[in-house]
Amino acid sequence: MKLLIINPGSTSTKVSLFEDGREVATESVFHDAPVLLQFENVNGQVPLRMQVCREFLSKQGVSPEEIDVFVGRGGGAYPQKSGVCVIDERLVEDTRKTVSGSDHASKLGVLCAWEFGTECGKPMYTLDPTNIDELDPEARITGIDGIYRKSQLHALNHRAIAMAHARKTGKPYRDCRFIVAHIDGGVTVAAHAEGRIIDTTEGAGGDGPFAPTRLGSVPVLGVIEYLEKGHTTEEVRKMCSRAGGFVSHFGTSDAEKVHRMAEEGDEHARLVWNAMIYQIAKSIGEMACVLSGNVDAILLTGGLVRFEDIVEGIRSRCGFIAPIELYPGEAEQEALCHAVLRVLRGEEEAYIYTGEPVWNGFPWEKKS
């Protein structure tokens, strides 16, 4: 059985071919911000991402019709529970509309899988979209009545890495208390406890550390002043997930380039690079407080964990909290494949997207 795994990110498209659970080939294609910002919105990137997938299959000598199941990373629709979800017309429509409010590249996995699946008449699935919602009530509240913090993170990799580390330690995931930091084109930091992601930075929502493509937490008055100078809300929205961070400072989302600039003595690049590390460490500290200081491990994952100075910068500030474990890159392709295989073998059940958010407000708001 052949599975095509489609995993679009803010700076790359990663595609894998699995056969009977075995990885046959994987390719990751980098997309710098100037290329992606040519598109008016994320939906406009579908042809580009589909081209990457088709070229990958061509290199493997496999036609789309030979694929048995198409699996895509998800996001953009209403928040749902964790697990495997069937990709159907309702999910695709809400994903296109970005009803969740976060227009992130992860949604393209569902849209590309849908294009392939409908073209070839094959089943399609997604797993742990970026907005699975398991937050504690306290994590939702803000200082403005009616505005709530959302669960918006690299949920697929967070859960895959947390579960892998739990297996490594011999404990069930539900009994572990982890802080996971996914560090790549976007950065999200979350607290895991009782088998749930109970709090997280809202990665593509202007919250938490800034990143190569994201603005992170910015003082609200500063944003108001920015808008008063003639900038638009659409510009700010783009900076939340596509045009902030390194892109705003340097016009590129290429971390290698910015790191090289910093190493070669560019003061601006050095300060911005170190500030990103500082902010990641600060968010880890916040999540340690969420877990009342009872933390089994801090798990660092994502593509930028390959940079030693990022790891050491976090270790120097957060090493007192808990042991720091490294999982460079991500485990998303394997997680997508094996979860869907468990469904196909009848070991787990896929759920159908409801078209309603899993959390829809507090009881006192539902008065008639």
What do these predicted regions represent?
Residues L3-G44:
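Short glycine-rich, Thr/Ser-proximal phosphate-binding strand/loop in the N-terminal lobe
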Residues E55-D68, K168-P172, I284-D296:
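Phosphate/pyrophosphate-binding loops at sites that engage ATP/ADP/AMP, CoA/4′-phosphopantetheine
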Residues L57-A105, P123, N131-T142:
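Short beta-strand-loop/turn "lid" adjacent to the catalytic site in phosphate-handling enzymes
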Residues K107-E115, T126, D133, I141, ...:
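Glycine-rich phosphate-binding loop plus the immediately following alpha-helix
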Residues K238-G293:
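Adenine-nucleotide phosphate-binding core of ATP-dependent small-molecule kinases
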Residues V295-I314:
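Glycine-rich phosphate-binding loops at beta-strand->alpha-helix junctions
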Residues E308, E312-H338:
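Conserved phosphate-binding/catalytic loops in two-lobed NTP-binding clefts
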Residues P328-S368:
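Structural signal for terminal/edge beta-strands and the immediately following C-terminal loop/tail
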